[in-house]
Structure formats: C-alpha cells, structure tokens
UniProtKB/Swiss-Prot annotation:
This is Small ribosomal subunit protein uS10. Gene3D superfamilies: Ribosomal protein S10 domain (3.30.70.600). Coiled coil: none annotated. InterPro entries: Ribosomal_uS10, Ribosomal_uS10_CS, Ribosomal_uS10_dom, Ribosomal_uS10_dom_sf, Ribosomal_uS10_euk/arc. Part of the 30S ribosomal subunit. One of its GO terms (biological process) is translation. SUPFAM superfamilies: Ribosomal protein S10. Keywords: Ribonucleoprotein, Ribosomal protein. It comes from the Archaea. The keyword Ribonucleoprotein applies.
Length: 102
C-alpha cells in the first residue's frame, strides 16, 4: 500500500496541533494507517538589534526570536483519505508538504 508523508511547518504550535487532529480524524473515518504526529526539532531564528537608533551611547542589544515548529505525519495513501486531506482547512501560518511513497 502507498504511504503519504505529510510535513507540517508553522510558527504557532496550537495551530499545528489543530491540523494534526484533523488528519487523525480523517484516518479514523477512512480506516487507514496513521503514524505520528512526530515532533521534529524546533528551529530558532535569532536576530540581534541595537536598541539605540543613532549608534551613540551604550551598546545595548535586543534579541528577537522566531521559532519554527515542525511535525511529521504518515498516513495511508488511500484515494478517499487523500481527497479529504486536500480539503483540510489549513491556517495561514501553517505550510504543508505531502510526499507520496510507494
């Protein structure tokens, strides 16, 4: 049987959990195998900036951080299940990559 590997990426872990729950419900309804969601390492992007705009005075820095969370879900690539996966309502800041394996 074919397997679909779905990689979810986003900055809000609650929205990722929402999409994972939708995928779990699809797997239960269609009766296909489900593995995951597997949490992958969180990527931290740190941007240090100077607090003072003119460059004079004490060199104090602020650090801004963006965390990118990732989840990996494996689901059986049944035709019915894949049609429902394509119809899942995905929030704006969550991206999905689907890879089919034979």
């Amino acid at each position: 049987m074919h397997q679909a590997r779905i990689k979810l990426t986003g900055t809000d872990p609650e929205k990722l959990a929402y999409v994972c729950d939708q995928l779990k419900k699809i797997a239960e309804r269609t009766g296909v195998d489900l593995s995951g969601p597997i949490p992958l390492p969180t990527k931290k992007l740190v941007v240090p900036t100077r607090k003072s705009p003119d460059g004079e005075g004490k060199a104090s820095w602020e650090k801004w951080e963006l965390r990118i969370h990732k989840r990996l879900v494996g689901i059986g690539a049944d035709e019915r299940a894949m049609r429902q996966v394509m119809k899942v309502n995905v929030p704006d800041n969550v991206s999905i990559e689907i890879e089919l394996k034979g």
